[in-house]
């Protein structure tokens, strides 16, 4: 399928919202823009996906998130029932659409019978890695684009050790994605239904406290820290990423 056919496929899909369809209609006469958005899918690697947030096959949007998550879910399902029960921890940063994308991923995992622990709001990447290990999850997903400009978002994936996927798992997901139709090949469950059924569970303050306790337990010179704590000056920059948790916990710690 060439890029123009892919564009027409998306334009005709009932999966698109009215706003998404209008966005595509607005570029109907811009052949270069259509080619840029539909010449091929984003490449899935050990760091997952990253791209600008537009409607299109080569961009970050809820349909690409669902498609990527279906591929990830297929790999987890192949590990067996125990892996599905261990489930996936999901967090997000403060970028536009990050919460929407995180929920979209959670709904696909739930639709595949995989349990999800979803952070209620933005969290930093280290806390996701901690949650994966703390709760014995099979994997993790972080909706973030790190240092990239605000137009970008990303989909980072982690395995049970809290680290980014090893190459063989990333390759397995990439191969699965080649077999999945971005619209018809995705299984998903309504968010509220998944919460009621217990497939999606939210995480919040309790996990925050466990994470901070784990971090502060690593302090190896508490006496020195206590001496300088009241006068220590810190310059902090959010750099488009998770801000609320960091600042509030730093002030309490």
Give the positions of each predicted feature.
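Gly/Ser/Thr-enriched, mixed-charge loops and adjacent short helices
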Residues: 33-38, 42, 153-244
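Glycine-rich phosphate/diphosphate-binding loops that line cofactor/substrate pockets in enzymes
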Residues: 69-88, 220-230
